[in-house]
Curated annotation (Swiss-Prot):
HAMAP family to which the protein is assigned, alphabetical: RNase_P
Keyword Cell division: no
Protein's UniProt name: Ribonuclease P protein component
Organism for this UniProt entry: Alkaliphilus oremlandii (strain OhILAs)
Purpose: RNaseP catalyzes the removal of the 5'-leader sequence from pre-tRNA to produce the mature 5'-terminus. It can also cleave other RNA substrates such as 4.5S RNA. The protein component plays an auxiliary but essential role in vivo by binding to the 5'-leader sequence and broadening the substrate specificity of the ribozyme.
Name of a matching Pfam family: Ribonuclease_P
Length: 114
């Protein structure tokens, strides 16, 4: 994923958390906010409660790859944050991918044409 499509700054995360719409399932929480651009910016958060750094990094890599492969299905113009819950530690790639798609559908962010 290109650097321009990433949420990295603390102020960007705070803005999304403050003015967001959110939804959750057993693996993830999603926060979205319209950003005024013609592309999405995405951030991934994994708390220290989830596990040690190796585990957190693995979960972030799985989240990133799941989103990257399904990015063309997602409507553009949003800041999106995915927050991993403790149950992500034991989840497979397919479970994480289906959780991401489930939340994106619930938030009406999946293009109907794809």
């Amino acid at each position: 994923m290109k650097a321009i499509n990433r949420l990295r700054k603390n102020e960007d995360f705070r803005k999304v958390y403050k003015k967001r719409k959110s939804m959750a399932n057993k693996l993830l929480i999603i926060y979205i906010l319209e950003n005024g651009y013609n592309f999405n910016r995405v951030g991934f958060t994994v708390s220290k409660k989830v596990g040690k750094s190796v585990i957190r990094s693995r979960v972030k890599r799985l989240l990133n790859e799941s989103y990257r492969l399904n990015n063309e299905k997602v409507k553009q113009g949003y800041d999106i944050i995915f927050v991993a819950r403790n149950t992500c530690v034991d989840a497979s790639y397919k479970e994480i991918e289906s959780a991401i798609l489930h939340l994106l559908k619930k938030m009406n962010l999946i293009n109907s044409a794809v």
